[in-house]
Amino acid sequence: PERIADLVEEMSNGQMKITVYGAGEQVPAFGVFDAVSSGSHQMGHSGGYFWKGKVPAAQFFTSVPFGLTADEINAWVNRGGGLELWREIYEPFNIYPIPAGNTGTQMFGWFNKEINSLDDVKGLKMRIPGIGGEVLKEAGGIPVTLPGGELFTALQTGVIDATEWVGPYNDLTFGFHQAAKYYYYPGWHEPGPMLELLINIDAWNSLPKHLQVIIETATKAVNQDTLDEYLARNNQALTELIEVHGVELRKLPDDVIEEFRVISNKILSDLSKEDEVIGKVYDSYIEFKDNVTEYHKISEDSFIEARNK
């Protein structure tokens, strides 16, 4: 959010200044949605899957298991009808959302025990939000929701057995390698997590058009810049984690991934039947995913296969 604030101030020649507060400074970590909705704060920055209790469909606009990658969700939101649906479901809460950052496909996370089979998932206490947490629970694990600032201590002291966070670039900074030995992939639970800038609709409507355009433009630029940064930095950070800090990089067993996939598909399908709004978002999301997956077979997928030979 600091980048958005800086860019908005620069583009508006100082006409608009946004004061950014860190998580917990003025609002609890998971209280951003309510703060913006009520108008106590004009803006907020977070991830939609934290509001699943209020707006279950919001999870599709962050990331869902085995869903859209960063490029794909950008395309769905900006050119595939996703943004219109997003704003439709947030409007009753007096919130105007804008895509505001994506860190790309995540790692599954940090573990203090090996995952060699589905039996190792049973009883596993893991910090994992959103539908990913529901999948873990269905597989026998124990999902825990904790804010980022509490994760290192929780992992180090054994309050949790594992945590997902972002990817090597972020995780190295957080020092998770000092609290857990095993680093698992792939990040099936968050293939393209989109963050959101939440704006109180009354505050938004009070702005002149040129400032609205500046905010939209600045946020769109930061959304892409964030993805570029993580793509450029992740492998360098991963190399350091392995070669300097002795982290053991592990791939989840195929049968574990497949079980997670089957459970994920059922949970998403069941969720889509809960009400008309969720069903509409689900149908749009899945149709876009199916279409882009077909095209990838003759574009990115086939090219990457050819390049890597």
Language-model features: where?
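N-terminal secretory/targeting leader peptides
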Residues: 1-73, 83-309
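General nucleic-acid-binding
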Residues: 76
